[in-house]
């Protein structure tokens, strides 16, 4: 609201009462003072209406902004509502009775088409796999050209292939003894005599006949390992600081050592002083895998096959220090120097015998 301003000027008086006529200078000064008061009053009257107009304009702008915000929010709500209605109609349109823009008949036709399509695809894949399996023998690998030379493994099991134990502390080596006893249960003499046959040494045990015919296996008795059999020394030498470690080749179907020469085992210090290992006894004494255990015909027909072993008896090894040992296979066609694979034709482990 615009305020009504009233002039506070004094009522006009006769000229004779306002100014003294006998003093001209005083008359002029009084006249000028009145003029200044009138000018200030007029300026004050002009400023107040301008401020009121600015306040009114600001109020009008605020009202317009509120109206715009209200209208924008209403438009947003209505847009979301329209979108929701469109989605609902797309999911289910009660007027056209369609779901996802398709009628029930259309959906039925699509399901039938896809059913027959995927059924045909599955039938073709099944037929291809069946035809492929007809060409593959379950008893003998079809392609053996890329089969690597045999790898090796050792027993007892040792974490990171580090054999660390103290001779005077049975708790440090007892688990090695338990591991060896468990591993050699299948090599017991009575079991081998019952399940397998006694084959002549030094020649391949070739068995003719159909590939699905059960094959016989040659005996490998636990007693062949002598001092490392656990029969004479139940602790396998660990109680005296002369440990036994067993080595065997992995099975490869159809593998035969080339030239009819048995594969031999040789162990030495990998790095360091060769005198750290002064004596090793091998069992069997030939330190080799006899030819009578080859070829291997696969687990389906060669059910009772027993892998041959070579035992290394470390009878004189330096004590109280880690000794890296490398055991290699030696023979024609044997690869034992693959840098990226420590178990192809060789095995590396550490002996640390404390007293």
Curated annotation (Swiss-Prot):
PROSITE patterns named among the record's database cross-references: ATPASE_NA_K_BETA_1 (PS00390), ATPASE_NA_K_BETA_2 (PS00391)
Biased composition (Acidic residues): 50-68
Compartmental location: Nucleus inner membrane
Disordered, as annotated region: 33-77
Regions of this protein lying in the Perinuclear space compartment: 130-355
Main location: nucleus
GO biological process: potassium ion transport; regulation of DNA-templated transcription; sodium ion transport
Membrane topology: Single-pass type II membrane protein
Keyword Transmembrane helix carried by entry: yes
Keywords noted in UniProt: Membrane, Nucleus, Signal-anchor, Transcription, Transcription regulation, Transmembrane, Transmembrane helix
Nuclear side: 1-108
Family: Belongs to the X(+)/potassium ATPases subunit beta family.
Function, in words: May act as a transcriptional coregulator during muscle development through its interaction with SNW1. Has lost its ancestral function as a Na,K-ATPase beta-subunit.
Subunit structure: Associates with a SMAD7-transcriptional complex. Interacts with SNW1 and TOR1AIP1. Does not associate with known Na,K-ATPase alpha-subunits.
Protein name: Protein ATP1B4
Native species: Bos taurus
């Amino acid at each position: 609201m615009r305020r009504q301003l009233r002039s506070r000027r004094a009522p006009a008086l006769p000229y004779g009462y306002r100014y003294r006529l006998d003093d001209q200078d005083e008359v002029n000064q009084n006249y000028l003072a009145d003029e200044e008061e009138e000018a200030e009053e007029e300026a004050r009257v002009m400023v107040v209406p301008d401020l009121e107009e600015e306040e009114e304009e600001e109020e009008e702008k605020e009202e317009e902004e509120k109206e715009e915000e209200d209208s924008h929010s209403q438009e947003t709500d209505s847009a979301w509502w329209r979108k929701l209605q469109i989605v609902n109609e797309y999911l289910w349109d009660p007027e056209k009775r369609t779901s996802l823009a398709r009628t029930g008949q259309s959906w039925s036709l699509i399901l039938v088409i896809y059913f027959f399509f995927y059924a045909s695809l599955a039938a073709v894949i099944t037929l291809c796999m069946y035809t492929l399996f007809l060409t593959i023998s379950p008893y003998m690998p079809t392609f053996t050209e890329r089969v690597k030379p045999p790898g090796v493994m050792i027993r007892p099991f040792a974490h990171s292939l580090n054999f660390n134990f103290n001779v005077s502390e049975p708790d440090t080596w007892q688990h090695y003894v338990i591991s060896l006893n468990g591993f050699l249960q299948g090599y017991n003499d009575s079991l081998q005599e019952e399940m397998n046959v006694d084959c002549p040494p030094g020649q391949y045990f070739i068995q003719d006949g159909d590939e699905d015919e059960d094959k016989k296996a040659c005996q490998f008795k636990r007693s062949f390992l002598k001092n490392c059999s656990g029969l004479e020394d139940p602790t396998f030498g660990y109680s005296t600081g002369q440990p036994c470690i067993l080595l065997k080749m992995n099975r490869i179907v159809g593998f035969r050592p080339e030239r009819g020469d048995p594969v031999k085992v040789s162990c030495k210090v990998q790095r360091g002083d060769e005198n750290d290992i002064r004596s090793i006894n091998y069992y069997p004494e030939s330190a080799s895998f006899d030819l009578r255990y080859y070829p291997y015909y696969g687990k389906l027909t060669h059910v009772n096959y027993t892998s041959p072993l070579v035992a290394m008896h470390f009878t004189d090894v330096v004590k109280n220090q880690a000794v890296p040992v490398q055991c290699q296979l030696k023979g024609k066609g044997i690869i034992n120097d693959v840098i990226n694979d420590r178990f192809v034709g060789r095995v590396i482990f550490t002996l640390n015998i404390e007293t």
